[in-house]
Amino acid sequence: SGMLSFQFNFRRNDFPKRETSRITPCRLNEVSSLATIAGQAFVYDRFHQDYKLTAKHCDSLHEKWVTNCCVNGLADVVLVSRQDGDPSGFIACRLAGELNKVRFGEIVLVSVASNLHGQGIGGSLIQAALEWFQERTDIVFVRTESTNYSSVKMYLNAGFSLIESSNYFRR
């Protein structure tokens, strides 16, 4: 399997405007709903590709990952999209420091409820994240599995550039 790394450079790119009014920071009472979304949505990730890990264990890792983003400071903000008041997806964003007066950010984790894929929610989450990052960073990074074609397409459509491809191997 492999990973693809993308970057969005605010000094070079404009980003497409989408409707993001239904996307706001995570509320503590939504963490369990986000964990459920994360536990069910990932199938292309490196954990599920590892034959030594059970699907249940992999799902649990994602549930803990988003929980750590929301309550343990792994992310600086977790933005949540909602449909009919209920969480439909999330994006976790982290400020990653500065080097030579260039400020960096990272999209840590993105997930949309599996029954809502293909409705543009992911693209709206990316838009909301870019709006959040715009005043705080110069460059935003994100990584995804090379086999996660819908995410690759989503990042490219949002103006991200592919900057690196890497493979990883397991014994």
Question: Across the structure, where does each feature detected by a protein language model lie?
Answer:
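Conserved GNAT acetyl-CoA-binding A-motif
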Residues: 133-144
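Conserved beta-strand-loop-alpha-helix junction that forms the acyl-donor binding cleft
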Residues: 114-117, 142-152, 168-171
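Conserved acetyl-CoA-binding loop-helix of GNAT-fold acetyltransferases
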Residues: 109-112, 118-131, 152-157
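Conserved acetyl-CoA binding element of GNAT-fold acetyltransferases
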Residues: 4, 101-114
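A short beta-loop-alpha structural element at the N-terminal edge
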Residues: 22-45
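Conserved beta-hairpin
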Residues: 74-95
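Active-site rim helix/loop that mediates acceptor-substrate recognition in acyltransferases
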Residues: 55-78
